């Protein structure tokens, strides 16, 4: 009876250790993808028409030449004629073809001006073939362009909001060619993690073998990939097995990372970030140098200054009347120094991110100051996380 209790206690302890090590669980479809099953990039060159005088300058040769070629294909000859239209813009059209998109399916596209058009507001994208990396046409884009901003102006002033030289064509791309995936003869495939991690990939293979072991055999390759092989005795449909596989809950682990954007002052930290015992004192030293221009004007009726090194003399009496005076421009320089008074804050070993933020907020630091502090803590060897600056 005593041995039984000890054995059960050991199982409970091991289970708790397993749970703490792996953290939370996520669906397999959210953390991994099948190798080779992916989107494909498409690109094309087109024209946007219907702009209210905000299109490309007529001096842009590629825009006028594109319009001329378009009209020629419509049976309108533009030889020896000058095009003067500012309601047209040359654009690049980009889109992503989903892995299993069928002929006739509709997807979105991004339209970006490549000329000097001020705005694509109110424009319509004319039929534009979209090609893949192999040069083949996979889709055709056409439709009204929608923007998230505007740009208007007159001869001497203008105003705008967000970015008006790029927009979207919602559901304006018609798929004309499919990408073939032969799953009927597939007996093995590879799962690639979206965030490579040795612990997660090992756990993924373990969960698949325990849950779907009668159908598949999973083997960890590295921190990025897990090979999956269909067993000979598997009589079920591969699509059904993949469907069950996608909904498996996999314990996910990740390394501690602190991401900082110096351009915007944004700092993002995961909950696993730990800091060793360190003392932090942060204060800003501001030095301001100001120069004012002043004019020194002599008193009224004072004698003029003499030339050379001789003092000024009264011509009638021969009396020395001082050096004389003249108008002089001088600089009045003022130097001011202001230093913030901050106390030293001691951060204990192994604190969580919540405690770190609370301690730094107590110092009154801003997000941009936090970037400098985290870099300094990392340099001191107290930050137990990877530091990424973007």
Curated annotation (Swiss-Prot):
Record-given protein name: Flagellar P-ring protein
Signal peptide (from-to): 1-25
Signal as UniProt keyword: yes
Subunit description: The basal body constitutes a major portion of the flagellar organelle and consists of four rings (L,P,S, and M) mounted on a central rod.
PANTHER family named in the record: FLAGELLAR P-RING PERIPLASMIC PROTEIN FLGI, FLAGELLAR P-RING PROTEIN
Pfam families recorded: FlgI
Keywords: Bacterial flagellum, Periplasm, Signal
Organism: Syntrophus aciditrophicus (strain SB)
One annotated Gene Ontology cellular component of this protein: outer membrane-bounded periplasmic space
Record carries keyword Signal: yes
Family: Belongs to the FlgI family.
Main location: periplasm
Function recorded in the entry: Assembles around the rod to form the L-ring and probably protects the motor/basal body from shearing forces during rotation.
């Amino acid at each position: 009876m005593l041995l039984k209790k000890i054995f059960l206690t050991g199982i409970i302890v091991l289970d708790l250790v397993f749970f703490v090590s792996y953290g939370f669980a996520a669906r397999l479809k959210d953390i991994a993808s099948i190798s080779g099953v992916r989107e494909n990039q498409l690109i094309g060159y087109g024209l946007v028409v219907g702009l209210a005088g905000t299109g490309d300058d007529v001096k842009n040769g590629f825009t006028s030449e594109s319009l001329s070629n378009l009209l020629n294909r419509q049976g309108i000859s533009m030889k020896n004629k000058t095009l003067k239209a500012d309601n047209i813009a040359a654009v690049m059209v980009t889109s992503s073809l989903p892995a299993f998109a069928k002929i006739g399916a509709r997807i979105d596209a991004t339209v970006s001006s490549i000329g000097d058009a001020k705005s694509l507001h109110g424009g319509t994208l004319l039929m534009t073939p979209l090609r893949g990396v192999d040069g083949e046409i996979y889709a055709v884009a056409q439709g009204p362009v929608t923007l998230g901003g505007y740009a208007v102006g007159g001869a001497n002033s203008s105003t705008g909001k967000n970015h008006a030289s790029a927009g979207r064509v919602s559901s304006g791309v018609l798929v004309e060619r499919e990408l073939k995936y032969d799953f009927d003869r597939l007996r093995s495939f590879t799962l690639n993690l979206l965030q490579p991690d040795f612990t997660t990939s090992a756990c993924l293979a373990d969960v698949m073998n325990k849950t779907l072991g009668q159908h598949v055999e999973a083997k960890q390759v590295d921190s990025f990939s897990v090979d999956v092989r269909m067993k000979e005795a598997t009589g079920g449909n591969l699509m059904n097995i993949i469907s069950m596989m996608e909904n498996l809950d996999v314990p996910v682990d990740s390394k501690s990372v602190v991401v900082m954007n110096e351009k915007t002052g944004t700092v993002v930290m995961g909950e696993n970030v730990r800091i060793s015992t360190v003392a932090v004192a942060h204060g800003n030293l501001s030095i301001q140098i100001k120069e004012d221009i002043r004019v020194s004007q002599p008193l009224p009726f004072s004698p003029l200054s003499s030339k050379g090194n001789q003092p000024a003399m009264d011509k009638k009496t021969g009396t020395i009347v001082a050096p004389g005076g003249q108008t002089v421009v001088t600089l009045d320089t003022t130097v001011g120094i202001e230093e913030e008074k901050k106390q030293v804050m001691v951060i204990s070993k192994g604190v969580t991110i919540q405690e770190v933020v609370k301690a730094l907020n107590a110092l009154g630091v801003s997000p941009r100051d936090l970037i400098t502090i985290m870099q300094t803590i990392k340099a001191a060897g107290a930050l137990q996380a990877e530091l990424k600056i973007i």
